[in-house]
Regions:
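Helix-turn-helix
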Residues: 1-25, 29, 33
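Short alpha-helix boundary/capping elements
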Residues: 12, 24, 88-93, 137-142, ...
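Generic hydrophobic, amphipathic alpha-helix propensity
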Residues: 30-42
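Hydrophobic alpha-helical connector segments
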Residues: 43-80
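Secondary-structure edge/capping motif, primarily at the C-terminal ends of alpha-helices
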Residues: 45-52, 91, 95-98, 141-148
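Amphipathic alpha-helical packing segments from all-alpha helical-bundle domains
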Residues: 78-79, 92-118, 127-128
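Hydrophobic alpha-helical segments that form the core
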Residues: 82-89, 123-144, 156-167
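Long amphipathic alpha-helical segments
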Residues: 147, 170-183
Length: 183
């Protein structure tokens, strides 16, 4: 909070604390600003997928990536992407706010639609393949957001990220991994 008041050239940290209560309240507010837009965009993409009939992996990967990738070119979007990358990379440390990123209604829907494409061993514990894909997307977009001034065209990056998400979701578990799961 001190950093924010310093950046805003303010001396009264009490006003900020009064408005947001604490750091968690501030993070919730920041996450909700873009999170609702991302959730709505993803929801529309999922509606299209369900309307088109039997879902396939690539459109589902697009539904995960595209709403977030759109933020690379929008106002404070890059800062949001960097923040969510940090939160998702350390979910235990940020347990009070990470759910504002990972438990959005559209992500719950996406998780159900993508489950049939996952190898059986990758559903739920201990591998959590869907969360791995979500964390990977946030990490990659957060890294890209840091370089936004040097790379203004994000189309190739976004398409490649979608390809990688398809691979993350559908890659079979190796014999070694399967054996370790059974131990």
């Amino acid at each position: 909070m001190r950093e924010i008041t310093r950046a805003a050239d303010q001396r009264n940290t009490n006003a900020l604390q009064y408005h947001f209560s604490d750091r968690t309240g501030l993070l919730r507010d920041l996450l909700n600003r873009h999170g609702e837009t991302v959730d709505q965009h993803r929801g529309l993409l999922l509606n299209e997928i369900e309307t088109d009939g039997e879902p396939t992996v690539r459109p589902l990967a697009q539904a995960l990536v595209l709403p977030l990738a759109a933020l690379l070119s929008e106002g404070r979007g890059p800062e949001y992407l960097q923040l969510t990358a940090e939160l998702v990379a350390r979910p235990v440390h940020f347990s009070q706010v990470v759910d504002f990123v990972t438990l959005r209604p559209s992500l719950a829907r996406w998780s159900m639609l993508v489950e049939p494409f996952l190898p059986a061993e990758a559903v739920g514990r201990p591998l959590h393949r869907r969360f791995t894909a979500i964390r990977f997307v946030h990490n990659e977009l957060g890294s890209r957001a840091k370089e936004r001034h040097s790379r203004p065209d994000h189309r190739l990056f976004t398409s490649h990220l979608i390809d990688l998400v398809c691979g993350v979701l559908t890659a079979p578990a190796s014999a070694e991994t399967s054996a370790l799961i059974e131990k």
